[in-house]
Amino acid sequence: MQKKVGTFDFPFTLNPYIGCEMGCAYCFVPQIVIKKSRKDFFHNVEIKGNIPALLEKELKKYSNLPQHLKRVQFGVTTELFQPKVLSYAKKNLGYDLIEKILDIFYNEDQNGNHWMLHILTKNHNIDRYTKQIAKMKHMVQVEFSIIHHDEIISRQYEKYTSSIKRRLDAIETLSQNGIFVRVMAMPFYGDLNDFSTLTGLVFSKGAQAFKNKLLNYYDWSSFDGTTLKDKLSRVTGKMNNNLAMFLIKSGGKMVRKSHVKVEMPKKRKRGEKFINWAIHPKLGLRKDFRRTCRFRLQKY
């Protein structure tokens, strides 16, 4: 059974590629997370061909972790469902890399090694994997990134992503197959009216949750006229005064936050020896308070 740890907490991440063809103007990954120029990051994608073997090894290695720590965010620093990358990988590896990764998680689950897989995307091509994800729906959450409901505005800042319509269609397809879908508007472009329009659209297609952060990290006007090779104009901590932070569910009402006590990895001090907390949980884990949001469902 999945336990709530926190809104944005994921102990593990999995990225099968380095680089991304989507070319989003607001992308935080090149130069900041991965030390590559934006031009290189957006034009050259490296595929980690050995990731299936490494993944099987790692999932078994950490199988004894507390269940609330066995959470993997899939596709954080790259878009998983880039069409050209998927085709190239299948041609050169002889199999579908995403399908293989999903199979590994599913097989581990069937053998008693249960993990939660959180799939992040802004591409409609995820619907190719609907049948496979549907059989894993007890252990999968899909999160679509959408910055605005308007196609023209979206295309201005997201050069090569799927259209809003195709993303909404994919949300509907996944939802109709019983798969949990959340929409993430981070960053979000627009005002409260745009926000209401977007939430209405995604909930009408079957999305079960929506989240937005109070912080809007970018000065949107700085993107006008930029190219993929231009340096990112980042305004750290810029507040979006039009919106509060939202974490809502379709048909649900958010109630008072509560705190729960769970085990989390210890933070290392400078020079302190690394402790593998999967092997030595008593040494590597500490009790910590994590804030969670709980919901009461209401019928409208």
Annotate each predicted stretch with a short phrase.
Residues 169, 191-300:
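Auxiliary Fe-S-binding modules of radical SAM enzymes
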Residues 92-99, 161-173:
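Glycine-rich S-adenosyl-L-methionine
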Residues 106-109, 134-137, 168-178, 248, ...:
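Surface-exposed amphipathic alpha-helices with a cationic face
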Residues 160, 173-193:
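Conserved strand-turn element in the central/C-terminal portion of the radical SAM core barrel
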Residues 72-74, 117-119, 142-144, 181-185, ...:
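Hydrophobic faces of well-ordered beta-strands that scaffold small-molecule active sites
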Residues 1-141:
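Conserved Radical SAM active-site core
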Residues 81-85, 151-157:
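A short acidic, helix-capping loop that chelates divalent metal ions and anchors anionic groups
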Residues 118-120, 124, 187-197:
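Active-site glycine- and acidic-residue-rich loops that bind
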